[in-house]
Regions:
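Extracellular low-complexity, O-glycosylation-prone Ser/Thr/Pro/Gly-rich "stalks"
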Residues: 2-232
């Protein structure tokens, strides 16, 4: 009897470990310059990413996260080495220093992963997300969102000390108004509508979130084994 119980325990541990296995995320740099990749888990308040690494052109690197992880991944130019200590230009993306985001929420409703490209705060470079090991792609089911948007209207441009454009604000990041940010009296899908800037971004980058309530045309789901994020 003891032998049988031991075998059952081993099987249980194996199955539990398999179900809780970490999920790999591969990041590729298709840009012409070095990029610095940042990773931050949802719920962590920090000025800097919890994980950061540089990628030279054509290089790639991978990291793994628990099967229940939720967080975001981004990349920036000119943030390697000591430059990365500049929180304003190289820290966690926000209204004043936006970046194109790859967002993930593993093991959500129905056991599926949910992922998207978010330009809600703004953007700074093209990117795409591709699942691996899931079912055959069908629209938002195991699809591969892509956004090649890179140009920025002058009125939304964020520039560095030399005047070079480093990222592009959204209308919400620029004005902070409840109407543009879907807050206050505009915090529901019924009251918050796409502003002109968000509509322009959505037209040029239809796979991505352009404002807070863009869920129906921006959220992808899949039971995947891992993901690849490609910048540029």
């Amino acid at each position: 009897m003891g032998y049988i119980l031991l075998k059952l325990l081993i099987i249980y541990i194996f199955i539990f470990s398999f179900l809780q296995a970490d999920k790999p995320i591969l990041v590729k740099n298709n840009c012409a310059s070095v990029i610095t990749v940042g990773v931050l888990t949802n719920g962590i308040s920090s000025s800097f990413p919890e994980l950061s690494f540089d990628l030279t052109p054509s290089a790639s690197n991978s990291f793994s996260k628990p099967d229940s992880w939720g967080g975001r991944v981004w990349a920036r130019y000119h943030c390697s080495g000591s430059a990365g200590k500049d929180a304003q230009n190289c820290g966690v993306p926000g209204a004043v220093n936006p970046a194109s985001l790859a967002e993930f929420f593993f093991k959500g409703t129905g056991g599926k992963d949910f992922y998207d490209i978010s330009l809600v705060d703004g953007y700074n470079m093209p990117l795409s997300i591709s699942p691996s090991g899931g079912s055959k792609p069908d629209g938002y089911e195991c699809g591969s969102p892509i956004c090649s948007l890179s140009s920025c209207p002058p009125e939304y441009a964020v520039t560095d000390a030399t005047g070079s454009v480093v990222s592009c604000m959204s209308a919400c990041s620029k004005t902070g108004s409840p109407q543009d940010c879907c807050t206050g009296n505009y915090n529901t899908p019924e009251t918050c509508k796409q502003n002109a800037q968000a509509a322009d971004v959505k037209q040029r980058c239809p796979d991505a979130y352009s404002f807070a309530y863009d869920d129906q045309k921006s959220t992808y789901s899949c039971e995947a084994n891992g993901y690849t994020i490609t910048f540029c």
